Amino acid sequence: MRFTCEKSMLLTGLNITGRTVAQKSTLSVIEGILCRADAALNLTGYNMETAITYQIDAEVTDPGQCILPAKLFGDIIRRLPEGPVTVVVDDNYKVSIRSGYASFTISAESAEDYPELPDVGSGRSVSIPQSALKDLISGTIFAVSENQGRPIHTGVKFEVEDNTISAIAVDGFRLARRTYHTEDPTGRNMSFVVPAQGLKEVEKILTDNDENASFVLGQKHILYQIGSATLICRLLEGDFLDWRRVVPTNCPIKLVAHVGDLTSSIERVGLIVSEKYKSPVRCLFGSQVVQLRTSTTIGAAEDQCSIAGDGRELEIGFNVRYLADALRAIPSEEVVLELTNGLSPIVLTPAEDKFDYAYMVLPVRIKNS
């Protein structure tokens, strides 16, 4: 095998595919990067759950394939001078790497035992701007469950309907939903749950521009095509929460607050709350103001924030981090807070109608003081 390509392109491919190379496996071959050179150069990392293949424009003079040591090969390419890199692999899997005056010789492995990637099939793809898909993921993934007792909730559920693509995450204490309204009908009606770990890799590859990404749904896997990268991820199976039944509607109390001001107040009173010293933030919603306070064995904190509306002196306790996470995910300057009573969830939505997002946080029971 022999190919020549630009260092910058090769390094980009190694950085992306290296994230799904298995760290430790009984199948040692997947601890390396599959390098296949034919019409183009394709690099693949696969940990048996998620696979990423990255295609690079290269001058291939001798087609072939091998398994390259991921860390060593990546470190070498990273330190080479800018410009073209030539890689030659002989029949004994000795690898020669040359760029400028620098040259290296390392060992590779046969690709004969590298596992086949899952066959997703050739179903109809759904396209979405990269920035929109990135927004769906970043706006929900923080709310996935870390409890392996309910594996289905360790992923994000996607619901594709005629003109919308929604992402929903729940962890038993909060819920996050974002919906993207497509310009053209998707022509599909389906739902599936993608593991958070796989989505984190998708998010890292996505850009903030409006170039399209696409995905194809298979029986047990999903394939994302993002520019030169192809990611295949195993889907989660099980019964996801019927989220529409748990999100309150027609809440009698609706308040409006400045996102930045309310977030800052919550973060301030949350300074004395930690994993060791847990305590809810007590929110007293009054007329035109919400008073925030919390106390732990290490101290106490109070603050207040202006709001529009009358909270009817309703006092509710919330997990500090969950409330702050929801506020940080609100893209508008103002947030609408919807409340019912001290034992019902709070629903947060952007004040601007152009954002179809919603966040729900369950209350924490507080003692009268």
Which stretches of residues belong to each language-model region?
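Structural preference for solvent-exposed beta-strand-turn elements
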Residues: 1-369
